[in-house]
Amino acid sequence: DDVIKQALAGMIKILYIAPERQENEEWIKATREMKLSMIVIDEAHTISTWGHDFRPAFRRIIDLVKLLPVSFPILATTATATNRVQEDIQSQIGGKISTIRGSLIRSNLMLKVIKVSSEDEKKLWLAANLNKIDGTGLIYTGTRVDTESYSNWLTHVGINAVGYNAGLDSDTRKYIENGLMNNTWKCVVSTNALGMGIDKPDIRFIIHTQIPASPIHYYQEIGRAGRDGKPSTIILFYNDKLDSKGIPTDYSLPKSFIDNARPSIKLYERAVEKLKSEPLSERAIMKATNLKQTQVRVIKSDLIDQNIIKEVKYGSTKEYEYQFGAPKLDTEKFEALRVAKLKDLDSMVNYVYTEMPRMKYLCNFLDCNENTNFDNCDNTNLKKESLEVPQELNNKLQDFHLNYFPLLNTAIATSKTVQGTKWKILITQPNVLEVRKDDILYKSCTMDNYTSVF
């Protein structure tokens, strides 16, 4: 309330807000009364359905933009937009738009790919080589469980490391973030929960143990290294060993996240049936359908976009009302987006196998086609990495496997030993299950799409 009063009184020059604030009726009313001189949309790719990090709440910004005169100054910035995303942003903002594109080339990033056949080979390489890299940096993993596994392994071999993920309490996250800025650890092992808003100029290395979902994700995450312009090491591990379904091991996890990004169609239908009876608030939808808040928010955003429901106000209460005569749910849009994301994932896999300069490959994907002499990767001037490690480290890894037990705050749904193989099912995130075979990730899926492995 105090901030709104100060803004209305003209006492604030620059006001930073989260897009979710645009869902607050008091805030919407206040912005209409403020003497605004400019709107800046940071991370503008998030307002595009085709953007790599689309967030429905960002669409609320467009609702505000539409209330303003066509000539009102708006600046939208992003470091990761393809031509398709750029065109989508332009069409949503509307009006006369000028586009300024800077170079995306990061010549100080030394790009390498290491192909492995197991998680153990990743761990062994890190143990043997991490201390040879100057400075401090980040190691990105695909799951919360792996942040703990890798950080504990590195600690086990005498490397100063700490694990970070969104499941930690806010005080612990803040402590680790401050430690990162002050070079307290050789490396912070994290999911992609760490990075947004981190502006540390001297991150000397970024290593991915799991392939990201697209070259755009990868470019954004490695772009946190070497912002001081000095050389920084960038490494991507890729396990191309085929699983029981003939799919490369490291392809399975990001593919499962893409396949399960949206709730199942039956959950959309469940929500629509409840809303046909009466208008419901978000919390009431959750209660009536027994769905989680994240699921309900995705569902209601899609239903609003397709004009199946609309938002209505009853005093200060916001509810969602079914529009009788509404069109049927168009699942083809969901499938088109899923196919597009799988295509992006395939492009990320192609990055592993490409023979062209790796930075050129990433820039081409982002529609930045510059003729530059690229010489900063293992396809050009840099030596390819070896997987050879001292036997002593193999012994330490065996000892680690015998004595390491995950302490991460995960609920064990079930565990079972079948013909000598240990199977364990963990709830690692809201609505996400991990199936682990002898403590190695076997598959990941949502609870809605889980079928027994036994």
Predicted features and spans:
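Helicase motor core with emphasis on the C-terminal RecA-like subdomain
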Residues: 1-270, 283, 309-319
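Short loop/turn hinge sites at secondary-structure boundaries
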Residues: 10, 183, 367-368, 448
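Structural motif
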Residues: 19, 428-429, 454
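Short, conserved glycine- and acidic-residue-centered signature motifs
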Residues: 54-57, 264, 341, 439, ...
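Short glycine-rich phosphate-binding loop at a beta-alpha junction
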Residues: 73, 453-454
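Buried hydrophobic side chains on well-structured beta-strands
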Residues: 109, 139, 435-436, 441-446, ...
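A short, well-structured juxtamembrane/interface segment
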Residues: 122-123, 414-415, 443-453
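C-terminal accessory region of SF2 helicases/translocases
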Residues: 207, 211-220, 226-430, 436-437
